[in-house]
Amino acid sequence: MNQTIDYSKASRVMIDSMKEYFKKCNLHAAVLGISGGIDSTLVAVLMHKVSQELNSEGYSFTFYGVSLPTKTTYSKELWAAQLVGNAFCDNFEVNNEMEEASSVVVDWLGNWGVKIEPLRSGNAKSRLRMIYLYDFAKKVNGIVMGTDNYTEYLLGFSTIGGDALFDYNPMQELWKSEVFEICKILQEQYADLKDYPKAAAIMTSLALKPMDGLGISADDMVQIGARHYYDVDDILQWYLENQDRPGYPDYIISSVDGYKIPAKTMDLVIKRHKNSEFKRNHPVTLSRERYI
């Protein structure tokens, strides 16, 4: 089930596939929402290479990056987003008006006085961000890039109508642990080239705890109840291979450090996967034959 990939080859495949797609569809611009997290950082690095290569080949292309912070965005997230945006985007902006817009919408959802729970307000912010990104993409005649990975897809770590929306996502089939490993290699490559701003930007992103930046929880692991995403990947891979077997073993062994991942943690992760199944089968429609 979990076949090891060649990380360097994976980077090249993603770059070449995006170049081919942009040319085929006559697209000359792409927009990426940059949070400072490792997922948007990887897409930013790849898109930087795509833009460089396309322009060097005589194909005009512009890569736009946008950071849309709110009051629930940690300062270290914004700092990482700025480092990544300035290092890898052809054009980068921080739009600080997102907080004002999201405050109005959240107040409206709470009937102008009732404080709504963090999950609802977080979903609203995620959807507002996509409104902005898609409008931005329309303005520059481009498309919106996605940053979801396979682990988050299986966990339902996205908002329907929000960050689950995108036009092109080069890394949907990568496990989160693979995203980390590819970024580590890219960071080392830039360090070897003495391109320290780019190396530092990736390193800063790697050092951040994965979080949604929407105020839903302190970080992803608080929501999941695991040590880190490497354990989560081990659990999900075990489950996909053994989902027909009843119950869980007392533990499984971490592929990283030999830690015994307990059944309690496995149960939390697998329940989250099962409870988010509707997100992976959305939207639901009826076939025409049902009406006849």
Go through the PLM ranges and name each one.
Residues 37:
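Conserved G/P- and acidic residue-centered "switch" motifs that form tight phosphate/ATP-binding loops
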Residues 128:
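His/acidic metal-ligating clusters that form di-metal
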Residues 1-32, 42, 46-49, 54-77, ...:
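ATP/NTP-dependent adenylation/nucleotidyl-transfer catalytic domains that generate, transfer
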